[in-house]
Every structure is written in structure tokens, then in C-alpha cells.
Amino acid sequence: MERIKELRNLMSQSRTREILTKTTVDHMAIIKKYTSGRQEKNPSLRMKWMMAMKYPITADKRITEMVPERNEQGQTLWSKMSDAGSDRVMVSPLAVTWWNRNGPVTNTVHYPKVYKTYFDKVERLKHGTFGPVHFRNQVKIRRRVDINPGHADLSAKEAQDVIMEVVFPNEVGARILTSESQLTITKEKKEELQDCKISPLMVAYMLERELVRKTRFLPVAGGTSSIYIEVLHLTQGTCWEQMYTPGGEVRNDDVDQSLIIAARNIVRRAAVSADPLASLLEMCHSTQIGGTRMVDILRQNPTEEQAVDICKAAMGLRISSSFSFGGFTFKRTSGSSIKREEEVLTGNLQTLKIRVHEGYEEFTMVGKRATAILRKATRRLVQLIVSGRDEQSIAEAIIVAMVFSQEDCMIKAVRGDLNFVNRANQRLNPMHQLLRHFQKDAKVLFQNWGIEHIDSVMGMVGVLPDMTPSTEMSMRGIRVSKMGVDEYSSTERVVVSIDRFLRVRDQRGNVLLSPEEVSETQGTERLTITYSSSMMWEINGPESVLVNTYQWIIRNWETVKIQWSHNPTMLYNKMEFEPFQSLVPKAIRGQYSGFVRTLFQQMRDVLGTFDTTQIIKLLPFAAAPPKQSRMQFSSLTVNVRGSGMRILVRGNSPVFNYNKTTKRLTILGKDAGTLIEDPDESTSGVESAVLRGFLILGKEDRRYGPALSINELSNLAKGEKANVLIGQGDVVLVMKRKRDSSILTDSQTATKRIRMAIN
């Protein structure tokens, strides 16, 4: 109070006023502080000060011709004094009002296109529904979130090139538009923005919003996709939340969601194949998500999820240096450790070999529904502070931390044998064995852990073995906190390596990820995922396997036909027939295979019994390891639609139906494509016509390489010899004639010669 009186006193003296208003500020440090850099140091003061001025705005000189000096009320709209330091005019805020009411009206067609992100947002909010407000403590944790709904996923550099090309096409400077998405967007935007009068700089800003993902590290409780983040200020306060359902989806969220589902499916499938890494790469390269190649999305999309990161690692991309265990992302915040193999005994006296981390370390653990801070020493949990949405989530985090601590009392709490296996029926490593065991039932673990008295600390409570909170006692070292633990904020990416079993390691050899860490949660993708790889056929069930197998044979018929004649074993071992085996009843697989292989051999031996439709129909059955038996079959059973259905060896059935007139094949009533039969099946002697210009020398001669199809013969040079596959699946050696004159006689002699060469 005294100070205020003193100030008032001072201000009443005219000398004080004069000093404060007239003296220049000439202390360099102060001038520097307020004038260096383009960043405004005190925005609210600046705003108040500007608005108190008569002419806070500057404008181009042309304004004087377009806006009158005074408005209807006689107020001055701009000053005759020009702005110090530039040749611009100083303008009153009233001029803006005048312009908005009386200024020229331009064509508005481009506004929705340029300001698309805003128009879309208005639509989403218009159709969204806001529910009731609930008052409760909000556990928010900072996460890196996408704050810009509806964007493409271009890198900053790619976007810059697109923007320059669209907005400033005549500017100098090399611009290379390479990716599919860059070219499509550029073409589309150039068409949309023809004759656009909106300032190019504004257009460039708005384009950037549409093309680039912008992320911020924000405190969030609840939905993290961009359509929830855009209304964060409406849905989450410090002590309240408002329910909200967005009024529309945006492609970038759909891509993120579908990418995670595709990656999980692919990693799960690859893990059970003979060569997981090769299979994973094959699937990533042959999969499309919403019409875009998955590998292109992986290169651009920063989503961090276990399966997605495994796919990125396989492609040689950098990923985050944090590691995953039990569905939690661990990031070491301090300390260090060395690893040493150690043998330990479980409560069931089973020996486990574990890699012990020796040394003191601190970690943050971030999961979907719980977060924690973990401090541990060698095989000892020092402290765990955990927070989560509910009791279940908190328990999950505690189990993971207890197992991760490698404490002896945890290992001794194992009851029964540990023999968990992964999808490929291989035993899990010891740490995951322990994790699975306690995730199933943690009662003994919590009971054996030990209890301690606790001091009361603000915002923290103890937790008892039955997961009830307590202010007096708690499981040793474990506390539940009201505050969440922030996600790791850095976007740093590190180089990693991946082995053929999909274990991802950093450069020090620490395992960051493995297929065991991939979530088993099933979801429905929002964008269409097209898996072209045969490994993924089974994802849509038995019918899809059946249709896809036959479609594959038809698409590749030319090469399949040659292999069928010459290298059947290689053909039977093709991975494309693998999924089909799961449809054939196990007990009879081998006999079917033996029967079909014998039948095929007879076709090869006996002239003129080559039957395209029958070969295609029975081929997948020959892929199983054959059992020799005398059994003959008139039909073969496949398990689809929940029961056994029959494929007739000779003739059509609902499963496999070939219409000779239309040449269409239908599988289970679904169109499977057109099947062109071999010409010789209907007309004999065609091969002689095809072989005009060639001399048939005799039986196949292996020295001249694999058999060519008749279509490939045209590439031969005159006098060159080659094996060629003719109608019935037989192979003969031919030579391209040196002279054209004798071509006519070829067709007569060819037929005789073929018969002789074969027999």
C-alpha cells in the first residue's frame, strides 16, 4: 500500500511524467531484448499498445485510391503521414470495417478449395455430437499427437516442392516431383486453383496444412487421433471432460489405423513362416492400403507401434530408440547396465536362462491405459510409481514392471511349468514365458512380493496385493499416483538391425522389439487393405484361400503349364499352394496328393490326354507330401463354409465350375476369371501350324535349356535350336529354319515328326 501511495505521489509531479514519456530508452541490453529476432517478446502488451494507437495497421499505397479518406461518419480511415521506415500508409481499424462493407466482391469459387481444411473442420463440428460434461480428476499424459486433420503424409521437402510447383510455377530452382502422391496432388491442385486471386502466400500456407503432418507434444486423456485433438480445448479440462463424437473421419487417421492393422496381420503371419524376414518383406511390398503401396506409407508415416516399427526396421528405416516389453514402451531416462547370462530356478524348480541387467537404471513406461516411472537395480525393483485409468490397467503395469525387474521373489512365485509357445509353435524366451505366466494369474506374485508401511505423500497412495488402495500399507516399492507419466517426447530415430526371426536390435545389441510384442487385438480397418501375397489369403477365411489359389494358377497358367510338364516337383513346392493345404482334411491330404500326382503322370505319359481344366482343378491337392496308395477318388473334399464340400475329379461341382462355352471359371459361385484351354484339346494338328518355319529334330535335349512355350519361339534366331512345349504338354527339340521357302512343307511333316519324336 505504501509503495502505491509513493508511486501516485511521484506520478503527480510533472517532472516524473516528463522523464517517463520523453526519455529515450538507450540501454543496449533492453533495446536488444525487445528488438532482436522476429519473435514478439510481449504479445499482449504489443496488442494493447497497437490498438490504443490511431493507425495501428500499415497498408500498400494503393489503399489510398481504393478506400476514401473518411467514412460516412466523417472518421479518418488513413493518415497522410507515411509509415516510418517504409513507403506504406498508416491505416485505422475503421478502414477494415469500411472495406468489409463496401469493398469489391470477388469470385468466391476458390475459397472452399484453398481453405479446405477450415471448411472441412466446420463440417466435422456441425455433424459432431457433444455429450454431457463429467467432473472428475483427469489423468493427462503428454503424447506426441497429430494436430492437423485431413493431411497427406508428405515430408516437408516433398511438400515444399509441390507448393512451389503449384503456387510459384515460374520461379527458378530445381524441383523434383518423384513420388506418386506428389504428382497426383500437384496435378489436382493446379486444376483446382486456376485463375485463383487469393494471395499466393496464403495459398502456400494452406497447402502446407493439407500436405504435411504437424505434431505437438500435448497433455491428453482420451482419444489421440487428429479429429479429437482439434477439439481438445472443448473436451478436456483440468477437472472435467465433455463427451464428443466427431462428425466425420479424415484420411490421415484412417491411414494410421489401417497401417497398424495391416502391419500386425503381416508380422503375425510372417512369424509362422519358414523365413519370417523374407516373408515379411514380400508381404509389405505386395500390400496396398487404400490404394497406396504400404511401403510408401511406411516411409512417410511416423506412427510408432510395435508391428509398424518391425516392418520399418525390415525395410532399413530408422525407428525410435525406446524398446517394448509387455505392451509398454520403455525409455531409459538415466543410469546404465551391462548384460550377463544367469541361470535361475523357478518355484517349480525349472531352470531358466535369463539375461540379467546389472546396474541402476530409471525408465518411463507408457502403455495404452497406464503409465509408470520405474527405478531398478540389479534384479531388484527399487520403486514403481504407476498411474492408470482403472484397477485392471494399473495391475497390468505392475506385473510388467515386476517381471522386468527380474527379482528373485517373482521367479520363485512361478507355479507349474513354463511352456508357452508363439504362433509358430516355438518356445518363447524366458522373460516372455514369465510375463505370460503372470498375466494369466498374478495372485501368487502379488502375495509373495512383500508389504511395507508407507509415509503419506501428496497425490500418492499405496496398493495392496488385492489391488485395493491404502494410505498406510503398500506392496514393496509400489505406489499409485494421480499424475500420469509423459510419453517420451523426442522424435529422434536410430539405425537398427533385424534378424530373420524379426527381432529388432539397436547398435549396442539391445533387443528393442520382437514379434512377441505385437498386440493380438483384432480390429476392422477403415481403408481397404489389399494383400496380394499368397501368405495373406487366409486372413479372409477359407473361401478366400480357395478363390485366390485358383486365380493365381489361371493368372500364371503359361509358366505353370511348362513346370507341370517338366519340373512338377518344383511346381508342387510353390508357396502359393501352402494356404490351400489347411482346407484339405488332414487325415487324407497325403492320399489325395499321391492320387493326383499319379493321375498327372499318366496324362504326361499318354498322348492327347492333356486337360487344362482338370489340371488346374486338381493341382493344389498335389502340393501336400504324397502317400503312395492304391486308392482312387471320384471327388476330393475341401473344408469351406463350415463343412466339407466336394470337388469332382471329372466334371463340375458348386465348388469348381468351368463353363466351356463362356470359358469362365466360377469358384463357390464367385467369378474366378477366364480360362483359355489349349487349342489342341479341341482341334488336332494345330501344333503343326504353329511350328511352321521350324524343323523338328527329335526328343527334348536338356542341353538347350528349359522348354519354351510356343509364343516364345518367335525370339529364336535362324538356325538356333530350342526345346519347345507343344500341345499335349510334350517337349520336342526344334531348330528355326535358315530359309523361308521350305515353310510350306513343314506343316505336313511336322505332325508325323511330332508323333515319332514323342514315341
UniProtKB/Swiss-Prot annotation:
GO terms for molecular function: RNA binding; RNA-directed RNA polymerase activity. The keyword rRNA-binding does not apply. The keyword ATP-binding does not apply. This is Polymerase basic protein 2. Plays an essential role in transcription initiation and cap-stealing mechanism, in which cellular capped pre-mRNAs are used to generate primers for viral transcription. Recognizes and binds the 7-methylguanosine-containing cap of the target pre-RNA which is subsequently cleaved after 10-13 nucleotides by the viral protein PA. Plays a role in the initiation of the viral genome replication and modulates the activity of the ribonucleoprotein (RNP) complex. InterPro entries: Flu_PB2_2nd (IPR049110), Flu_PB2_6th (IPR049114), Flu_PB2_C (IPR049115), Flu_PB2_CAP-bd (IPR048298), Flu_PB2_middle (IPR049111), Flu_PB2_N (IPR049106), INV_PB2 (IPR001591), PB2_helical (IPR049113). Pfam families: Flu_PB2_1st (PF20947), Flu_PB2_2nd (PF20948), Flu_PB2_3rd (PF20949), Flu_PB2_4th (PF20950), Flu_PB2_5th (PF00604), Flu_PB2_6th (PF20951), Flu_PB2_7th (PF20952). One of its GO terms (cellular component) is host cell nucleus. Keywords: Cap snatching, Eukaryotic host gene expression shutoff by virus, Eukaryotic host transcription shutoff by virus, Host gene expression shutoff by virus, Host mitochondrion, Host nucleus, Host-virus interaction, Inhibition of host innate immune response by virus, Inhibition of host MAVS by virus, Inhibition of host RLR pathway by virus, Inhibition of host RNA polymerase II by virus, mRNA capping, mRNA processing, Viral immunoevasion, Viral transcription, Virion. Belongs to the influenza viruses PB2 family. It is found in: Virion; Host nucleus; Host mitochondrion. The record marks K627 as: Mammalian adaptation. Influenza RNA polymerase is composed of three subunits: PB1, PB2 and PA. Interacts (via N-terminus) with PB1 (via C-terminus). Interacts with nucleoprotein NP (via N-terminus). Interacts (via N-terminus) with host MAVS (via N-terminus); this interaction inhibits host innate immune response.
